[in-house]
Amino acid sequence: LKAIFNEYGANIPVTDKMRKKLLTLGVHLRDDTHFISIPERPFLRAGYDAYEGSLAKLMQSLVGQALAGTITPERALERAAKELKKHIQSHIEKGSFVPNSELTQKLKGGNHPLIDEKKLMDTLEYEVHMK
């Protein structure tokens, strides 16, 4: 869910339960605050776009190898997916994203958007399915 909220942004309705939780953390929301807005931080789309050229070259090479029979199509796709994952993780670490709000900085203890305990980066996975 965090990944989707960050990729596309979100307006999260503030519930009474959320207000109480934030109060325990020392954060008081104004009575007229009805949503918490998370800005768009497109790490997947922007990560792909940033490395599209090098990924296209890799894919050309892998397709050639698969056609020559030196690598299976499954292995070619596996290598391409692994490379894309590596580039997206790198983009998350280096990316220039909308800064965290003061509240988020206080809760996380830092201001590196998309990274707190590296859970998002560490949970990026891929699957190769052949039909």
Predicted regions, residues:
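Short, Lys/Arg-rich flexible segments
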Residues: 1-131
